[in-house]
Structures are given as structure tokens and as C-alpha cells.
Amino acid sequence: SCYNPCLPRSSCGPTPLANSCNEPCLFRQCQDSTVVIEPSPVVVTLPGPILSSFPQNTVVGGSSTSAAVGSILSSQGVPISSGGFNLSGLSGRYSGARCLPC
């Protein structure tokens, strides 16, 4: 199916952001951990001060995952609106029967 989670690869070569059957995998980092975003509704709300300054060492709500996602998005130039942002919007176009065949 098109919703299999992406598995980390052992090599750190260049990889596409998405391919036909692994579209839910939007971010792949060759670091200690890999951030995988699956097509389920996940809302990350960031408070005002972080939206203006994006400090790299800030932890949002005690969750380092939220801070990591915010840091990755801000470092790649993805705008984050003042009302927070919805990660499901990034993968919403891959839902239902719109999965491309392998």
C-alpha cells in the first residue's frame, strides 16, 4: 500500500523527498535520528516568541520532537503561520485514491 512508513537507510547519499509509494516520508536527515511524518492529522502549535526568533535550543511543551520539526521546517524555509500549522496539510494531497502506482 502507499502508506507504509519509511524506514531509515544505512547510506547517507542523496534521497528524494518523496517517491511514488513512500510519499508520507517528507523529511529524511542523515543524523542521529530521522523525522518521519505520516499522513495522519498532527497539529503542532508553536507559541509567538518561537515564531519570531526560531531558537535552535528551545523545547516546545517539553517535546523535543516538536522543536526538531520546527527547526527543520524553519531551516528549510517553510513558513509557519502565527496560528500554528497543521502537518496533515503537507501530506493531505496523498490521501484516498490519489496514491500513484509504483
From Swiss-Prot:
Protein name (database record): Feather keratin
PANTHER family on file: BETA-KERATIN-RELATED PROTEIN-RELATED
Family to which this protein belongs: Belongs to the avian keratin family.
Provenance organism: Dromaius novaehollandiae
InterPro entries membership: Keratin
A cellular-component GO term for this protein: intermediate filament
UniProt GO MF annotations: structural constituent of cytoskeleton
PTM-bearing positions, type N-acetylserine: S1
Subunit-structure text: The avian keratins (F-ker, S-ker, C-ker and B-ker) are a complex mixture of very similar polypeptides.
Record-linked Pfam families: Keratin
Keywords: Acetylation, Keratin
Keyword flag Transport: no
